[in-house]
Amino acid sequence: MKNLKYMITGALIASSIFAKDLQEPSSWNNIRFSPKLATDDPAYTLINIGNFGYWQKYDATSAHTPSGGSGGIYPRGTAANVYLDGVLVGGYTGDVLHVSGTIYTNGLVGGYIDDAGDLQQGGDVRIYRIRKNYESLTFDQVRLDAAEINETTVSSVSDAQMQAVLDQYEADWENWPTHLGAPFYDLDSDGVYEPEDGETPGIADADQVIWYVASDADVATTASLYGCTPIGLEFQFTLWGYNQPGAALGQIVFKNIRLINKGSEDLTEAYVSLWSDPDVGDYTNDFVGVDTSLSLMFSYNGGPDDNDYAAFGLAPAAVGYDFFAGPIVESAGDTAISNLQKLPGYRNLPASSFGYFVAG
């Protein structure tokens, strides 16, 4: 895996029989406050464009809120169905076993690995979130966004918090880090970001996109996970969603993980694993399963009712993780999907195993 780039595209999928569309009444357009409050280095952000609320932190902590709670929330504004999730990569350099990634302990830090193998942090290395219609959001849409990102109620949102949401969208759009690997619409296919020629940030015609980069380049942090030394592995995360709360796409968060081995040795016999601690409302009665034909791992409530969801008048939701396009390997005559493009001569690997443990 030396200097090779692997793409994994997956999806977090939720469903609820009684899920309702979020209501965002129209009000003033192009509302602006003052002063500007964009943050140069936000630590957290979330996908909250459809019916799913899904938190991310710049160091690859995933589905966990800034206040330490469950960070997969479905439907938005109601109960949670994911407490924490992450990705693990394991393999050998020579006869030395390495494992990098995130579980309850995080073995990654925010930042990328430069050509000299050094960790680069600060400056433009942070978490970004864009929304393509941010300039035309209504007063109520901004207020709802501010409530969710500040973990407060709509009635408690301040003008300053609303302004910060707008300013952050603008700052992230204007400073979208294509030079670090963030996706954009390359109209002339030359690999160069040229906004003056109409090229814009984004992927897959999504309405909202998050991008950030993390790595296993910090020795102490990597060792805290499983006692291993770093691989020199860079993780570039792109997440996106669609403003379709009443349609199927509105129940999905897409996640693309770009893995780049910037170490000096090949990583062999490598495995990539997604893991999750799903808490479907009350965590004490959840079940899990897998559909091997779909590479779909899922969790659901053990009964027709759940106290957390009942508080909102809802039946309990279910949640699943699907490999839409797993890691690729050479395979003559086949065609893989990588970076949302067809790649002849390769195939995508499906999920090869599934495991679970019970705790609590």
Question: Which residue stretches match the model-derived regions?
Answer:
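Bacterial Sec-dependent N-terminal signal peptides
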Residues: 1-23
